[in-house]
Amino acid sequence: MRLIHIPALESNYIWLLADSNQHCVIVDPGEASPVESVLTYKGLLPQAILLTHHHQDHLGGVPQLLRRFPDIPVYGPKETNKKGATILLKEGDQLFICSQTFSVIEVPGHTLGHIAYYSAPYLFCGDTLFSAGCGRLFEGTADQMYDSIQKLIQLPDETLICAGHEYTLSNLKFARSILPDDPQIALYQKQAEQLKAKNQPTLPALLKLERQVNLFLRCKESFLQKKMGTHKHDPLSVFSTLREMKDRF
């Protein structure tokens, strides 16, 4: 399988997963033109579109793509029913496309109906989990987002996180403000800066590394709890406080 990232809009990534037969799956096409360009250049034929949630920057390209490829199915959560999805999905559903099995994981938080798709080793998680960060709580609660992330971190270390935005450097800047002396975060920030200087993506990110550099995955660590100065040492309170701090950062 070939994983292809397509920069779109201001900070989005659209993902393509292609097989040896030149067939591919399109994930979260926020706009159509860059997708069409890549499909033409690489000679790929889409077999399906996968949507993670209903925000326009993740599905704005669906109508134009369907005009060109009218027969391909569009999968998504219930909240995308009126946004182009033709087949609605829920927790536990499985899709078999391009010789790959995609498992559906419900991950409410960023939106109430947000889902992720896992096809080892790839995790297409939209705006739930970013490298060194997590999504804003536009509709859901901190409890929901925390539980969603707990689901995702049960996946194997070699999981590749294919997030919906290139937010890595800003997330690492926030992480350094909390843990300025953390060597892993400092090293990853340097590596991310080098990639940006070469106009290269920081994604996909390895889940094994995220366990070390993503504060939102480290809420059970007593060291982080003390560093934040929170008097509530339960992981959910730490997560909620971190999310509020990031919103103000």
From Swiss-Prot:
Binding site for Zn(2+) 2: D57, H58, D127, H165
Gene Ontology MF, one: hydroxyacylglutathione hydrolase activity
Residues at which Zn(2+) 1 binds: H53, H55, H110, D127
BP GO terms, sorted: methylglyoxal catabolic process to D-lactate via S-lactoyl-glutathione
Essential cofactor(s): Zn(2+)
Annotated SMART domains: Lactamase_B (SM00849)
Keywords assigned by UniProt, alphabetized: Hydrolase, Metal-binding, Zinc
The keyword Repeat appears for this protein: no
Pathway: Secondary metabolite metabolism; methylglyoxal degradation; (R)-lactate from methylglyoxal: step 2/2
InterPro entries referenced in this protein's UniProt entry, alphabetically: Clx_II_MBL, Glyoxalase_II_hydrolase, HAGH_C, Hydroxyacylglutathione_Hdrlase, Metallo-B-lactamas, RibonucZ/Hydroxyglut_hydro
Superkingdom of the source species: Bacteria
EC class name: hydrolase
Catalytic activity: an S-(2-hydroxyacyl)glutathione + H2O = a 2-hydroxy carboxylate + glutathione + H(+)
Cofactor note: Binds 2 Zn(2+) ions per subunit.
Entry EC number(s): 3.1.2.6
SUBUNIT field: Monomer.
Stored NCBIfam families: GSH_gloB
Function: Thiolesterase that catalyzes the hydrolysis of S-D-lactoyl-glutathione to form glutathione and D-lactic acid.
Protein family according to the UniProt entry: Belongs to the metallo-beta-lactamase superfamily. Glyoxalase II family.
Protein name in the entry: Hydroxyacylglutathione hydrolase
Organism placement in taxonomy: Bacteria, Pseudomonadati, Pseudomonadota, Gammaproteobacteria, Enterobacterales
Gene it is expressed from: gloB
